[in-house]
Amino acid sequence: EHELSKFLSRLLKYKLVVGSTVLILMSDHGFGPFHKFIHVNNWLRQHGWLRLKQELKPRLKSAIFDMGFTPMGVYNLLMSFGLGYLKREVVRGRGQGLLKTLFLSFDDVDWSQTTAYSLGNVGQINLNVRGREPQGIVNPGPDYEKIRQDIIDRLQELRDPETGEHVIQEIYRREEIYWGDRLEQAADILFVPTRMEYFGFGEYEFGSNQILERMKRGISGTHRMNGTLVMHGTPVKPGVEVEDACLYDLAPTILHLMGEPIPSDMDGQVLTEALTAEYADPSQVRYVDSDKTAKERSVTQELSAEDESTLTERLRSLGYVA
């Protein structure tokens, strides 16, 4: 924050933002305190929506898991010796095979008896849908909707036993959030934890044997839904607080300020309330029909094996790919 303030001061002091140039400072999320992880797969297992295999090896792994031999237990031990950095090397690096050998994982799940599972962090639940998942058992239609509603109802009841407060603040069906031809790739249920002070654990399928787990060491804060937007320049109306701006309002606003037309299928809107009368005039906001053919071609164009490998490694180094 201090370095950012110094940078902005230099920009303004030396009048580097001149004429019609606009400085836009934005963050794609805010930040705040973090209290506990939610281990969603444990919660699903507790309610019978996720079941484990009954063969000897999964049963042994399950038994020692329930006794406390978990990835988070090992991580806390490493942290006590100052070796917490090794977690990134294992979880986000190339140690997934070792994790699956030592600890409970999706390899130990009985998919023929499992109706729901969780992947990713924050709050996402997928149903094990027939014809969509490799071993899906939930029939699309009424069966799917009933199970989804049952899970939503139970999520609304989840409370923190230490405080008694509800852990989940908002719950959505995927079609209430997403749209388009990639909707099938979204999780079936999405939820926002209370004040984002709880957080769905997403670095491993079964990170702990608890449902709610206080972080003993390591991170103390995490993301918030609301970010920051600051605009400065001649086209910007001073002293205005913009209400209900979204991330996807930035692109059409920037195109408009550059004097460029906005593609007709682009999400978001020009933030005219932040602009002076000259730039806020609706008649000056231009739109252009999107080139569907070029768009489809760019979406379907396949990467070479080398490019895909390079992209994957870059994403892995940032922690987005395991």
What feature does the model see in each segment?
Residues 43, 150, 162-186, 242-245, ...:
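Polar, surface-exposed loop/tail segments
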Residues 304-322:
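Short acidic, low-complexity intrinsically disordered linear motifs used
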Residues 1-5:
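A conserved hydrophobic secondary-structure block that centers on an alpha-helix together
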Residues 194-251, 257:
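Low-complexity, glycine/alanine/valine/leucine- and proline-rich hydrophobic stretches
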